[in-house]
Amino acid sequence: MSMSEETNNSLSSGKCPFHHGGSDQSAGEGTGSRDWWPKQLRVELLNQHSNRSNPLGEDFDYRKEFSKLDYSALKGDIKALLTDSQSWWPADWGSYVGLFIRMAWHGAGTYRSVDGRGGAGRGQQRFAPLNAWPDNVSLDKARRLLWPIKQKYGQKISWADLYILAGNVALENSGFRTFGFGAGREDVWEPDMDVNWGDEKAWLTHRDPESLAKRPLAATEMGLIYVNPEGPNASGEPLSAAAAIRATFGNMGMNDEETVALIAGGHTLGKTHGAAAATHVGVDPEGSLIESQGLGWTSTHGTGVGADAITSGLEVVWSQTPTQWSNYFFENLFKYEWVQTRSPAGAIQFEAVDAPEIIPDPFDPSKKRKPTMLVTDLTLRFDPEFEKISRRFLNDPQAFNEAFARAWYKLTHRDMGPKARYIGPEVPKEDLIWQDPLPQAVFNPSQEDIASLKAEIVASGLSVSELVSVAWASASTFRGGDKRGGANGARLALAPQRDWDVNAAAVRALPTLEAIQRTTNKASLADIIVLAGVVGVEQAAKAAGVYITVPFTPGRVDARQDQTDIEMFNLLEPIADGFRNYRAQVDVSTTESLLIDKAQQLTLTAPELTALVGGMRVLGANFDGSQNGVFTDRVGVLTTDFFVNLLDMGTQWKATDESNELFAGSDRASGEVKYTATRADLVFGSNAVLRALAEVYASQDASEKFVKDFVAAWTKVMNLDRFDVK
């Protein structure tokens, strides 16, 4: 049969000639590039959270909208909701206190201090995979309970802020005094695709604590927030869980005292749910039927809700007053002897064997039960170091209250970055070391002062490469995940940053810039470091025949050493910085993948990444002064030579050794070696997407465009942490 005959037959039958059923032919379905090439470079990660996915538009100002919010009325509505039990998801003891605390905890608890990703700062609990994690069973109901409130206040309160505020109000409603609340978390409108949740393909795959400590993961099993409450790999052993607890809470930047306070405080209120076997529980929200409207885990056990609810499979109530704050967690932990038992769902837990039935039933006031604990709760009694802290909290409830208030505040605000981002009437005045505090501004340089400082920098004798390198070293520590790092504070001049291997050459310019700061006394060192980069880029552009003024916004301040947590700042030390052709001797990923990772942390787009790398190479900004990727004989001139020479087919590239990290580029005709390069250089010729961008800048008409694009991207990086002026 000919094609025309097939088409005519299809038309006569009323069918689309090309859609005959069978395989899914909708957009995005079918075999894709990553099915064929699983290791394909994820350049698309740099296109996340653009204005194309934001229904509010680029002009939306959340801080401005929040200022219109009746904050006390909002808190009043949340408080009323706590005891407004709904038949479709009845509240335990008539209160949603425990549910909302868990929702806030599990939103914030995905944060990892190693890479700054995760956390509650963008409302990611609405999206996969977090909305469908095994550890988040039933939190879809918590979020749905909040919808009428979100609907009422609209864009004056983000989902991200509302989740955490609901947890705070729940604690306050239980009689607990919180440390405070800072709003300012802005929603995004799609899942974060850059977060590495792990390599496991099956939920609840166990991870060894030692390997966990080497990776930026915040849970011991895929799909958990922290640790398996039944012990490592459901071992039922409290003491063996200590290492896993320390590893996971440590990856969030929590010490032992904060860890004990958080576990005990979180388990002072509410309960776990394990009325029957997990076989009764249906699929998660992402896999549920369309008519389920985003709700998942429907249970076939009894009514499926209330007394019949199944969440974790554990059936534990810790306190005699599960909706009111108390010290019963520690009192029960140490007062009774505990025997291992199983929940109705078959999960391992512990029961107080010598205790009377003093725990109220959540739905039948005539019933009582014995106190119960999770395996990991008992770790706080049997691990020697945790036990010391727990006994202190047992004997000093006020110390426990203070420790939990501060630890909860840290947990729920850790990924928000500097205090300048916080808004609202309940922001505490106290500066905390984990917020990377900054002093008040001392200088307010005028335009004349700035011009004078630029002249001083020009006269200093520092080269373009030195000027650019010191500014980049200062600003490029910024992480878009938790908003830490950046040039504000001039922490490049402090420990530990001044001692990092990647900064060894860059910091050589600091004594000269510090002398300028002291003698002129017109601006902070932080401003002068960034201004040095401005001077370097302007000189390089001028040498290329393009006269351009690089934007500069003063107002940065200089942090003190006592405002700098060395251990936490060491987490900002890059494993790799492809912009400076730096890679530590750590086998974690390919160099080009680490380049994408760094660019994503700097919130750069793929074109911005391309322009910056090409510019940094011709400006001679390699961390060690090497010639790798410096495809020019005009170092210090902001030309497109990197792209022109990289894409020249007259050059043939070969690896110099078996590591495939360093390459030599030889003239195809003569065999003479012309250049050396790393994977962070050659990827702009090998990856199809990056090559397409490189071709734009290699074109003969691109010289001025390249300078303008480089300046725009450079200025963006220099100002990433300027929340004081945003």
From Swiss-Prot:
The SS bond pairs are none
- Can you state which reaction this protein catalyses? H2O2 + AH2 = A + 2 H2O; 2 H2O2 = O2 + 2 H2O
Which Enzyme Commission number(s) are listed? 1.11.1.21
**Short name of one Pfam family for this protein?**
peroxidase
GO biological process: one example: hydrogen peroxide catabolic process
Gene3D superfamilies per UniProt: 1.10.520.10, Peroxidase, domain 2
Q: How is the cofactor bound?
A: Binds 1 heme b (iron(II)-protoporphyrin IX) group per dimer.
Region: Disordered, residue numbers: 1-34
Name the domain of life: Bacteria
Has the keyword Protein transport been applied to this entry?
A: no
Its needed co-factors are: heme b
Q: Where is this cross-link: Tryptophyl-tyrosyl-methioninium (Tyr-Met) (with W-105)?
A: 226-252
- Processing after translation: Formation of the three residue Trp-Tyr-Met cross-link is important for the catalase, but not the peroxidase activity of the enzyme.
- Site note Transition state stabilizer, residues: 102
For this protein, what is any one GO molecular function term?
catalase activity
Q: Which family does it belong to?
A: Belongs to the peroxidase family. Peroxidase/catalase subfamily.
NCBIfam families, alphabetically? Answer: cat_per_HPI, PRK15061.1
**Subunit architecture:** Homodimer or homotetramer.
Protein name, per record = Catalase-peroxidase
Record organism: Enterobacter sp. (strain 638)
Gene name in the database record: katG
